[in-house]
């Protein structure tokens, strides 16, 4: 049985992204056919690849084959007309095929029939390319009148040729993701990656560096770093005091450098996360202040009473477009706190309870005497949401009921949040200065390592350039580039087969720089001077660099200033003398290793290592796994820094 085919003219402006439903054997009126056979879409739908449809089982092996393809009834995503009879919904798929080739251009606005809302089907999210075989077949069938559908068995259904760029029939059954679903999926993947990375941002501290931290830290200290990386707002000095890594599986000479690099990694990660969190806090408080709740509260504030004037002052500071100082916020919060204290009841939480409830979420937050525990727990949830990078409106008591007590509680909380954000932003600036100070200290420590191991010349020169850019530039990109450079230098130091004693070398430099005072209580004459003691310290064969051959004359010099007490301290002043270590002294520190002594020194070093591992206060424990290899050096802007280093070398700043 074959149904009678009708042809109708296409409405002007109708988009080409329409889906036609196969018709049943029953004939229907033309009006119902015009209304129910077309499902318009608000945006263009792109056809799916032939290979994707074949892999999904939605089309036969060849699109242009004689075997017809089929598709099920189109399921509307948001409409209400999905409960109609199948006989009313199924229409011929090739009935309007001649009009498709000569229709309006793709992407033209839809013009649904007056009084009828368009039925929208969500387009698939899979990109597509122009179809090769099906496109030509669609044009041929369209020119022949659109009656080329075949039936091979009772289970086969009618199909329409697919025009280039037109949605195929099988796309009606494909599952598609909306934009919000994709954003949620990406956010969840990012959260999982950060959680596996101990809370470190992958763009700040690479995952391979985090694996090294897991290897050198104790298990309880790994969890401690994870809690610190949650970036709970706190003072800068509190953060620097909490970062105290407990090392494991680290050589004694490498602990000082490893501890400083880990501390730097934790603080710079906190700095990065805190910047993003502060921006989200500002957005959340601005959204809340400009919301309908605060507007309704401002409309009912009475300036005739004392509490009304305190509320009006707080609203003025919250909605002001000019800059508000910390003193102004503190004055407003103090006046609101006085009004809340007068309205307190025996059931109201004490200030000690308020601080104990909120201290785990924000240490910088300024609290007040809230009148109810419901308000306290509500504001605790808001602080927790702010820690989770919430950018929407904050929940207030005035949403349910606007009264004087709720207004004072909400305004005290909002003013406290504004004051907290101001101090949090100031803490972020303090952390940046502290990071630069820390890099200066690490640079001096790395130079002491280089003086003992001159074979690290190129590595130290590269690190010095990175640190110089980090402490001299105002943008954070140069500051973030210092973290991989420090881990690269640590990787090179770990590969050295030598004892690293930075404080011992610094003591020798102090003795060499200040040789004018003989040792007290020694009558040995000039042979007991501090210079000779310093030379004896640095010429120990066990401190020699086993890889250094002729690099001593190419030692990079650095200005080192040694401080010592100059005279008898008084009750008002302690005189201190600063003496610099000359370049000649640095060039003559270590003697070269004679070839006949290298084998003997190697055996002595092995015996000393075994002794230190057996008698150290941090013995080497059983390794959980071999230490992960750190990646090779890959610095950003390397060409620019190399060019800058060559210019400095040519100008004489490097002593080669």
Curated annotation (Swiss-Prot):
Chain intervals with Low complexity compositional bias: 59-70, 140-160
Keyword terms, alphabetized: Host cytoplasm, Phosphoprotein, Virion, Virion tegument
Location of region: Disordered: 1-174, 615-656
Location in or out of the cell: Virion tegument; Host cytoplasm
Keyword Phosphoprotein in annotation: yes
Top-rank taxon: Viruses
GO cellular component: host cell cytoplasm; viral tegument
Pfam families per UniProt: Herpes_pp85 (PF04637)
PTM (free text): Phosphorylated.
Bias kind Basic and acidic residues: ranges: 46-55, 635-656
Ranges of Pro residues composition bias in the record: 625-634
Keyword Zinc-finger annotated: no
InterPro entries in alphabetical order: EF-hand-dom_pair, Herpes_pp85
Subunit organization: Interacts with UL26.
Note: Major target antigen for the anti-CMV antibody response.
Function: Plays a role viral replication by forming a complex with UL26, thereby contributing to increase its stability. Mechanistically, prevents the proteasomal degradation of UL26 by inhibiting its ISGylation.
Family in the record: Belongs to the herpesviridae pp85 family.
Protein name: Phosphoprotein 85
Organism: Human cytomegalovirus (strain Merlin) (HHV-5)
